[in-house]
Each structure stands twice: as C-alpha cells, then as structure tokens.
C-alpha cells in the first residue's frame, strides 16, 4: 500500500442532527448508515463479566494470565526470572475469581462501603497496586458480586489520594507490596480513619507476605492476605448467592485529572466496557482473536489497559504481565512472551527507539554503517513509495529487532497521547508493520478514535469508532470554526463532542462538572479541539484544548494554572507560564525573574543580572525555590519544574502576551518564544533518554 492511498474515516450522517448551526456533523463510522439503528447489542444485553465468564468456561484449558517465575537473585540483589512464561488457565482464573468473590461477599459488612449517587447504588472497594494476576482476579471477582472498584495510582500525588479516599469513603483497599509503604504513609499523614482494611496482593508478587502484613497492621490496618484469606475454599457462599453485575452496573470509578485540580471520578458501566469489545469486533480495526498475546505494562488503574485486557480475555487470548519495569525488563519480557499486538504510549516507544539506535552505535565499523544504511534506505522507500519491507535489509539488520519484540508482532497500537509522525515512521522501518493510533480518554471508556490497520499515513488520529458519533462545534474565541479553509478546502475545526454507548455515566458526586460535561442533546464535550482533513479521508487531528490543560507523553494531564498559582509565590519570580505538550516528558516554565530579589540574592546589580538570561547561578537559584514550593504543595513528579526558560522582557499587553485584563495569552507566549522552547525541548529530550 502506498502513501497516496487514503483510507476513508469519518462519514457524515443525515439523521438525528442536533440543534444549531455552529457545528459540523454528525460524523459516524464510515461503514455505518444510521448510527441509532446499527449500534445494536451483539452480546444480547450481557454484561462484560457475563461474557468473560462464558469465555472462561468455554475455553477453560487455554492459557489466560501469565508471568515469569522468580528463580533467584543476582549479586546486586535484583530478581532473576525464568526464560519462559507460566500461565494460569482460564478455568483456574475463573475459580480464583469465584473464591475471591465469595470470601469478599462473606465479609461484606466489614469490608464494603455502601453508597449511592443519582440513580446508582454502590458497593465500593479501592485498588492501589501494580499490574499483576491478583489485580485482574480481584477486579473480575468484584464484578461477580456487583462490587465497584475505585482505582488509585502512585503518580496521583498524596493530596489526590486523600481526595479520592475522602470522596468514596472506602473501608478496604487492595494493595501490592511495592505500594505498602506509601499507603501506610498516606493513612497516617491524613488520618484516614474510615480506611481500616488492606488486602495484600501476595500470590505472584514475590514478597515477604508476613513482613508486609505486619507493616500494614502497624499503620492501623486490619490486614489480609489475598492468597490465604481470599483464595481459600468457601462453602458457606454459593455462586447463586452472588449478585452478578448487570449491563447498567457501574463497574469502576476511574479517577482522572480535573480542570479544578481535584481528580474526577469517571463512572464506567459494564455496558460501556462491553461496548468497547463490541466496537473492536464490529470495526475490525485491530487484528484481535483467540490466537493473540498481550503484554501488560501500562497501569491497570487507567481504563485503557483494563479495556485491552478485557478485550483479550473477551476472545480467550493470552495476557502476560511485565516482570519488573519498562526500563529494566520490558524488552526481555517481550522477546520471551512474543506479543502479537503491542498496546503502548509514545513515551515507551521513544525509550525503545533510543535503545535500538544505541545498539546501532555500539556495533562500530562496517556493521554500524550497514545498520544506518538499512535504516535510511527503508525510511526513504517508505516516504517515497509507502513500502515498509525490504528483501535484503529485513533479514540482515531488522530481523534482530523483530526478535527483540518476540517475532510475532502484527501491529503496534499507540494511545494516550498523539504519536509524533517520525516516531511512527521509525517503527514501520524497524518492524515492517503498520502502526495504529488510538485516541480516547477515560470518559470515553478509553477509546473513541482509531486509525485503520491498513493506513500507513499516520497524519491524523483517524476517525470515530462505531461506538460513538461526533460533532465539531466552532470555538471562535480560539480562532477555530467549522468554516475554516486550508489550501482552498473546507477543514472544519472546533470542540469535539461525542455521543454513544462508549460515553461514561457522569462524574461521581460532582454535580458541577456533570452539568458542564453534557449539552442538551446529550453530547459530551471533550474539551479537545479537532480539525477534519478531507484530503486525509476526513481524518481527525487534535490541534488544541478549549481549556488551559495539556497532556504529557506519559498520558498524564497537567493543569498549568494550578501549578502557576503556587510557583508564582517565589520571591524570585515576577511572572511564570507553565508549558508542555503531548510529545514532552516533563513540563518547562517560562519565567520573568524578579530582578530586585534575584540580584540581591546573587549579590550583583540588576544591570549585571539582565545581561545573561542563561546565567546558571540564576537558574539554580530559581529552580531550588520552585522545588521547595513544589514539595510544600505535595506536587507529584510530573508537576515539578526541572527546566526553565528565563526572559527579562516579561509578558505585557504591548508584546501581546497579556490581555487588557492581565491574563497570559498562552498561544502568543508560545509563538514568541518558539525557537527557545524548541532548543530547550531538544535538551530535555536528550537528557531524558
């Protein structure tokens, strides 16, 4: 397939048009004619857990959840794992899920938080853990008895952890050994008296269970062993005593960053999640079947990874968990496991790409020259002709790279943040496979847009899946309208608004945000600004945000106003603007220093100070103070400023960086300092590799 071939994406639907004339659409999946009629339930009104139970029974002997067994430690005390994956079968996983559900049900009164919001009743527990077999077993066990899970993760920060616990009032939290220390610190620091029980994941996590349980008890928890207390036989409770989740049951409350700074609890139902599986099957956008293998390393606390695992289990495929971390074991794990589809984020691919090029450089001599000749030849062939294979170089050079991924990889699906085109191009060259880009958010059950498996262009995020329909609503204040013209062609732009079975059920106990999220026609306003490109098959590209918020390459949202309100308290800062985007791993700050305070602290004159905006002593002074403020404010690692750009001209009305009401015009600042930002970004990228 050549680059000139354009796959057709978003298609206009005539029926059910919302009111108003400032929108383009509705757009629907190109193979559909009528969204309302064709969004039918292929699963006969089943819940996700009902479907998964049927698959676990039908394919009981197939391998389901796998991990590499620990066989020892090296001289540094680091774990050594077997060179193979060992699996629990679908039948074994089903039995563990039922045991967990029964034992949780028996202790329901002491362990479960009972709550309600709107028309939903909740039985709540929390999960605070890394990816492991126990995570999936506990999650499905909860679904077997209509227990809703509230998910937490370490990068939330301590204040956000407290906020979620206060909002849900969870009595019980399931925790992996690596997070026990942080959990205990949070409980004691914030005096979370209602959080009284902790269940330790100790089946596959290679921990000293006795020691970690004692640590939990010292912090004031009633501590339980997942293995000893929740995987034991329970003859007191029958399967029929369990209240199996129905399609309308809220499966999970997934917390995501909010524009106010407080996390928002996104309520996702069983219907939402099975609609994702239904969409994948109906659209045939991803080559997913019972022969598939998935490596799980993206956090299960985020809905994307849960959606992926649900999809693989929904077709009775295999899932293997990462043994260590992305940096330490991911590549070795993949070479052993052999994933067929790789679900990842740009940041991980950037790390892998660096390892590949480092490997080229380490070859030296003629082998290094051969590797780079092969790379540049394939890249040029792709850009000119759309060809991603090479008869000679694929065997001589790139076969070794394919082996790094296990030799079975059919495609990579990159999500969470937009993927830079050059990154996608490199992996087409390395692996001779298509790169799919998915785009979604927690509120969309993790997925709403997807490029096609056969499309090699990777210019846009593709089109809507068959699980949503979309309108584009003009945002004239930001300069985006549905009448925009590029090169003589109408390319509508505006806020992306969506409707359909993938859309969430609202924010937990947050009436204000719920009132803002949906319009009178039932469309969810995403806050993302998108543009339709007719000459790329009506593909959609994210071009801006309606509100002042952005996402880093890890997929984490950053709220600049929240950070600026803290950092501006520094005596050494007169003005500050936090900047970042989805290709960056860290934020940077554009700062106008307070000349008087800085000069005094550095014992120089103001005239001397303003001569050098790159003064390392000045940068160190300001960075140290920002670090102090970040610690005091309990900012997480991604909210801490590690890179700064200094300017003494400041943001003014005259240079159009301030409005008459003294608000920073972020776009103008970005444009004004574009060259310096790009230079600093290049340094940041080099340092993070």
What are these regions (language model features)?
Residues 139, 156-188, 276-295, 326-340, ...:
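Conserved ATP-dependent adenylate/AMP-binding module captured primarily in the ANL superfamily
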Residues 87-90, 251-277:
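Conserved AMP-binding A3 loop
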Residues 478-481, 487-552:
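Conserved ATP-binding/catalytic segment of the ANL
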Residues 2-18, 144-229, 623:
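Structural core segment of the AMP-binding/adenylate-forming
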Residues 63, 221-226, 231-255, 262, ...:
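Conserved pre-ATP/AMP-binding loop-to-beta segment of ANL
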Residues 221-226, 340-343, 352-457, 469, ...:
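Gly/Ser/Thr-rich phosphate-binding loop
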Residues 98-102, 266-287, 394, 399:
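Conserved structural elements of the adenylate-forming
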Residues 69, 74, 79-92, 101-156, ...:
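Conserved AMP-binding/adenylate-forming
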């Amino acid at each position: 397939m050549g680059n000139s071939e354009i796959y057709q994406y978003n298609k206009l639907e005539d029926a059910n048009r919302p009111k108003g004339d400032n929108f383009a659409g509705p757009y629907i999946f190109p193979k559909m004619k009528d969204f309302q009629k064709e969004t039918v339930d292929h699963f006969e009104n089943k819940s996700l857990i009902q479907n998964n139970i049927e698959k676990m029974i039908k394919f009981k002997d197939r391998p389901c959840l796998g991990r590499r067994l620990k066989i020892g430690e090296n001289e540094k005390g680091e774990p050594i794992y077997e060179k193979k994956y060992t699996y629990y079968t679908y039948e074994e996983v089903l039995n563990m899920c039922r045991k967990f559900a029964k034992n949780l049900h028996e202790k329901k009164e002491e362990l479960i938080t009972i709550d309600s919001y709107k028309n939903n009743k909740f039985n709540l527990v929390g999960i605070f853990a890394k990816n492991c077999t126990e995570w999936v077993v506990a999650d499905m066990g909860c679904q077997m008895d209509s227990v809703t899970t509230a998910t937490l993760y370490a990068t939330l920060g301590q204040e956000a952890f407290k906020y979620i616990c206060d909002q849900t009032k969870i009595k019980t939290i399931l925790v992996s050994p690596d997070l026990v220390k942080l959990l205990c610190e949070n409980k004691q620091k914030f005096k979370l008296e209602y959080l009284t029980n902790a269940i330790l994941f100790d089946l596959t996590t290679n921990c000293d269970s006795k020691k970690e349980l004692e640590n939990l008890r010292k912090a004031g928890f009633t501590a339980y062993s997942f293995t000893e207390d929740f995987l034991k036989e329970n003859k007191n409770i029958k399967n029929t005593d369990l209240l199996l989740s129905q399609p309308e049951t809220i499966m999970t409350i997934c917390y995501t960053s909010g524009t106010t700074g407080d996390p928002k609890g996104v309520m996702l139902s069983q219907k939402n999640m099975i609609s994702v599986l239904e969409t994948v099957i109906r659209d045939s956008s991803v080559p997913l079947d019972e022969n598939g293998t998935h490596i799980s390393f993206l956090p299960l606390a985020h809905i994307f990874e849960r959606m992926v695992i649900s999809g693989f289990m929904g077709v009775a495929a295999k899932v293997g968990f990462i043994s260590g971390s992305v940096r330490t074991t991911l590549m070795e794990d993949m070479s052993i496991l052999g994933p067929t589809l790789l679900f990842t984020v740009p940041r991980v691919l950037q790390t892998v790409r660096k390892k590949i090029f480092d490997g080229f450089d380490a070859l030296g001599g003629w082998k290094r020259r051969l590797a780079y000749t092969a790379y540049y030849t394939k890249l040029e062939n792709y850009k000119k002709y759309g060809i991603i294979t090479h008869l000679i170089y694929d065997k001589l050079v790139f076969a070794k790279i394919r082996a790094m991924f296990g030799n079975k990889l059919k495609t990579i699906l990159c999500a969470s943040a937009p993927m830079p085109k050059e990154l996608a191009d490199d992996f087409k060259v390395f692996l001779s496979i298509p790169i799919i880009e998915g785009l979604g958010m927690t509120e969309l059950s993790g997925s709403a847009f997807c490029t096609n498996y056969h499309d090699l262009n990777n210019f846009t995020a593709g089109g809507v899946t068959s699980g949503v329909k979309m309108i584009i609503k003009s945002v004239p204040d930001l300069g985006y309208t549905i009448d925009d013209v590029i090169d003589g062609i109408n390319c509508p732009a505006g806020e992306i608004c969506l409707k359909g079975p993938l859309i969430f059920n609202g924010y937990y106990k947050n009436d204000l945000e719920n009132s803002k999220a949906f319009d009178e026609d039932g469309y969810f306003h995403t806050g993302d600004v998108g543009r339709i490109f007719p000459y790329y098959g009506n593909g959609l590209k994210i071009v801006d945000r309606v509100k002042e918020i952005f996402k880093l390459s890890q997929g984490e949202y950053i709220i600049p106003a929240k950070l600026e309100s803290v950092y501006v308290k520094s005596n050494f800062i007169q003005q500050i603007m936090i900047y970042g985007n989805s290709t960056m791993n860290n934020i940077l700050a554009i700062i106008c220093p307070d000349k008087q305070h800085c000069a005094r602290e550095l014992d120089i004159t103001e005239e001397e100070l303003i001569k050098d905006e790159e003064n390392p002593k000045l940068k160190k002074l300001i960075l140290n103070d920002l670090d102090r403020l970040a610690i005091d404010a309990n900012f997480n690692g991604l909210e801490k400023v590690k890179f700064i750009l200094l300017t003494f001209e400041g943001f003014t009305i005259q240079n159009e960086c301030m409005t008459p009401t003294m608000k920073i015009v972020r776009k103008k600042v970005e444009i004004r300092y574009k060259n310096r930002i790009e230079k600093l970004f290049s340094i940041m990228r080099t340092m993070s590799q």
